[in-house]
Design a protein with these regions (language model features):
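Residues that scaffold, gate, or flank divalent-cation-dependent active/transport sites
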Residues: 1-108, 113-115, 122-130, 134, ...
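Short, low-order "capping/linker" segments at domain edges
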Residues: 151-157
Length: 157
């Protein structure tokens, strides 16, 4: 058997895209998911429309409203997001029997011995990306020999 291969799937807009799935009429509106920690409210997930208006993840809510006055917000729902990620994890099981959640918005798949079933690593990654897009999910992929390298490629390459 060849070397270990790990695919990292990172969903940078997972919480916002989950909210858009729940409220279908918001798809073209700028939407931010807001995390509250004490009196501090920060944006933890953004729709594509919000990012296009110049809003960035990690920014304070008041600053974001100054940049984008029509910004819609929804409170962060960690339990709902975890359940949604678990559903995505079950879907990803079609590519590998070993799928693990990585943080609140990522998955790691051990592709060792599995990729040939999909026509190779590139074809498997392409299929995963296309199926995510068809479901309205933005995904960034990283493929490497170690989980750490795959994680970094998905987020920074």
């Amino acid at each position: 058997m060849g070397c270990r291969r790990v695919l990292s799937l990172w969903f940078p807009r997972l919480a916002a895209e989950r909210a858009l799935r729940l409220e279908r009429g918001l798809t073209d509106r700028p939407l931010a998911i807001v995390r509250r920690a004490g009196n501090l409210q920060t944006l933890c997930s953004l729709s594509r429309a919000a990012e296009a208006k110049g809003v960035h993840r990690g920014r304070g809510l008041q600053d974001a409203r100054a940049i984008c006055p029509d910004l819609l917000t929804r409170a962060e729902d960690p339990r709902g997001q975890a359940a949604f990620l678990a559903a995505v994890r079950r879907w990803a099981g079609k590519f590998s029997p070993w799928v693990a959640e990585e943080g609140a918005a990522g998955l790691l798949l051990d592709l060792t011995g599995c990729a040939h079933l999909f026509g190779g690593e590139a074809a498997l990654a392409r299929q995963a990306e296309q199926e995510c897009a068809a479901q309205g999910l933005t995904v960034q992929l990283g493929l490497a020999d170690t989980a750490g390298a795959a994680w970094a490629l998905a987020r920074f390459a």
